[in-house]
Curated annotation (Swiss-Prot):
Keywords for the protein's UniProt record, in alphabetical order: Carotenoid biosynthesis, Manganese, Metal-binding, Transferase
Gene: crtB
GO MF terms, alphabetically ordered: geranylgeranyl diphosphate synthase activity; metal ion binding; squalene synthase [NAD(P)H] activity; transferase activity, transferring alkyl or aryl (other than methyl) groups
pH dependence (UniProt free text): Optimum pH is 8.2.
Catalytic activity, EC: 2.5.1.32
Similarity remark: Belongs to the phytoene/squalene synthase family.
Pathway where this protein functions: Carotenoid biosynthesis; phytoene biosynthesis
Record's function text: Involved in the biosynthesis of carotenoids. Catalyzes stereoselectively the condensation of two molecules of geranylgeranyl diphosphate (GGPP) to give prephytoene diphosphate (PPPP) and the subsequent rearrangement of the cyclopropylcarbinyl intermediate to yield 15-cis-phytoene.
Any GO BP annotation: carotenoid biosynthetic process
Name under which the protein is recorded: 15-cis-phytoene synthase
Class in the EC hierarchy, top level: transferase
Catalytic reactions on record: 2 (2E,6E,10E)-geranylgeranyl diphosphate = 15-cis-phytoene + 2 diphosphate
Cofactor binding remark: ATP is required for the transferase activity but it does not seem to be hydrolyzed during the reaction.
Pfam families in UniProt: SQS_PSY (PF00494)
Length: 295
């Protein structure tokens, strides 16, 4: 996790040992699936590229993910997922919802509207929030909705941060309707002369994430205190990255936006207070305007 997700690595240290083990095993499976689809190792180029097509690799992931529900697995990532799924009663549908997000990449899905982008965010991150919440003992739908909201917010932030990197890899998760409003297309959005217009799209995406971050905060009381602290820390770190993207404007993609170690520590301290006060604060009902996960 230190290599694959530095933003979440700090937060993960705050879980109790049992929860952290399960979280890391779930992460290992998610990371493995991502790497297999992209033919990478921990997000980096593979020295021995696969001879299979992306479609074939996706089919193998689906087959191997289905097997843990029935037989003993020996491949590390799938053995880890098997242990987590059985220990925490993770719904098989969640695992396949996650794989559906990779299928969207494989099939080069186009995203016309914000709703389309949010559907992608659900598959690659929102459903991971659901599985994480189940690891932490959550079973009620209201808290699961908030966990999904946090995943959506995380992915919206990731998309804003990685717009140019994704475009260079031939991927675009921005709503085409938003791009059209700025006179951009998926083919020219990463051109240096378009950075000012692109920064406005990124700002809009970060602003879209805000109500999902707020909604997620209302789910913290439904978690054990240490888990609430860990999740609040991750929430604050990712939100800070989105703020940096906005603050950097057209320069946001000159370097990868991230938080420094001192910033992470400050956010960790702030999150401890957030986790505690969330238990006595009044939380508004979840807004009907937010994207609703499939149930």
């Amino acid at each position: 996790m230190e290599v694959g997700s530095k933003s979440f690595a700090t937060a993960s240290k705050l879980f109790d040992a049992k929860t952290r083990r399960s979280v890391l095993m779930l992460y290992a499976w998610c990371r493995h699936c991502d790497d297999v689809i992209d033919d990478q190792v921990l997000g980096f180029s593979n020295d021995t590229p696969s001879l299979q097509s992306a479609e074939q690799r996706l089919a193998q992931l689906e087959m191997k993910t289905r097997q843990p529900m029935r037989i003993q697995m020996h491949e590390p990532a799938f053995a880890a997922f098997q242990e987590v799924a059985m220990a925490h009663d993770i719904l098989p549908a969640y695992a396949f919802d996650h794989l559906a997000g990779f299928a969207m990449d494989v099939h080069e899905t186009r995203y016309q509207t914000l709703d389309d982008t949010l559907r992608y965010c659900y598959h690659v991150a929102g459903v991971v929030g659901l599985m994480m919440a189940q690891i932490m003992g959550v079973r009620d739908n209201a808290t699961l909705d908030r966990a999904c909201d946090l995943g959506l917010a995380f992915q919206l932030t990731n998309i804003a941060r990685d717009i140019v990197e994704d475009a260079e890899a031939g991927r675009c998760y921005l709503p085409a309707a938003w791009l059209a409003e700025e006179g951009l297309t998926r083919e020219n959005l990463a051109d240096p002369q378009n950075r000012k217009a692109l920064s406005r799209v990124a700002r809009r995406l970060v602003e879209t994430a805000e109500p999902y971050y707020r909604s997620a905060s209302a789910g913290l009381p439904g978690l054990p205190l240490r888990s609430a602290w860990a999740i609040a820390t991750a929430q604050q770190v990712y939100r800070k990255i989105g703020m940096k993207v906005v603050q950097a404007g057209s320069q946001a993609w000159e370097q990868r936006q991230s938080t420094s170690t001192p910033e992470k520590l400050a956010l960790l301290v702030a999150a401890s207070g957030q986790a505690v006060t969330s238990r006595v604060a009044r939380h508004a009902p979840r807004s009907a305007d937010l994207w609703q996960r499939p149930v």
